[in-house]
Regions:
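Sec-dependent signal peptide recognition
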Residues: 2-7
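C-terminal motif of bacterial Sec signal peptides marking the signal peptidase cleavage site
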Residues: 12-14
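Bacterial signal peptide processing site
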Residues: 16-18
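Secreted/periplasmic proteins
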Residues: 24-116, 126, 138-146, 156-193
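Short, mixed charged/polar active-site loops
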Residues: 123, 128-132
Length: 193
């Protein structure tokens, strides 16, 4: 019975939804792809890892959980989906499918000095793949390992439209206090207007 349910979920996930296609891509971030500035977090920080210094907070090895908030295509698929995110890019919610971000609780931010917009890294412990991200959403106390769809994709973690991961992937999330002002090093990825 479980196999049938999984096959049905996979079949539904692969269906083409032309009505919602405009919500599923088209550029970095949840906002107008022509209004992006370096530093929005679409790539790594200028100066790379060395610019960030030592991590102020680490999740330790934890099970990856996918946050679909900010991605309009997640509505009705993820039971915990929310249209808005705590952080914003160009005045709009941060789209989980297009922007690598991590989720931290207010308590985790308070004890570590990390703020919205600070840089983070996500590492897939099985493969060693690491991606840069920003802290862009607030979650419940005690939560760890919650990452955006884009961050999961960046480290090779597969997931279903309802936010369930394929398998039981583990990640380490590190966040770096006081790094929000470090611009992204991504001018080649920006769209000129």
């Amino acid at each position: 019975m479980k196999r049938i349910a999984i096959l049905l979920i996979l079949a539904l996930a692969s269906c083409d939804d032309d009505e919602r296609a405009d919500l599923q891509g088209g550029g970095p971030g949840s906002s107008d792809p022509n209004n992006i500035v370096a530093g929005d977090g679409f790539c790594g920080p200028q100066g790379g890892s060395s610019a960030l210094g030592q991590a102020s907070w680490s999740s330790g090895v934890t099970t990856a959980k996918i946050d679909t908030d900010g991605n309009p295509a997640g509505q009705g698929l993820d039971p915990k989906w929310q249209a808005d995110t705590t952080g914003h890019v160009n005045g709009q919610a941060v789209n989980s499918a297009q922007y690598a971000y991590v989720v931290m609780s207010q308590r985790q931010m308070d004890t570590s000095g990390v703020s919205m917009g600070d840089w983070a890294t996500v590492t897939n412990t099985a493969t060693g793949q690491t991606t840069f991200a920003r802290v862009e959403d607030r979650g419940p106390d005690g939560g760890t390992g919650e990452i955006s769809q884009a961050a999961a994709t960046g480290v090779g973690i597969e997931f279903l439209p309802n936010s369930f991961t394929v398998g039981d992937p583990s990640v380490v999330v590190n966040a770096y206090a006081g790094t929000a002002s470090i611009d992204g090093d991504c001018p080649s990825q920006l769209t000129e207007t």
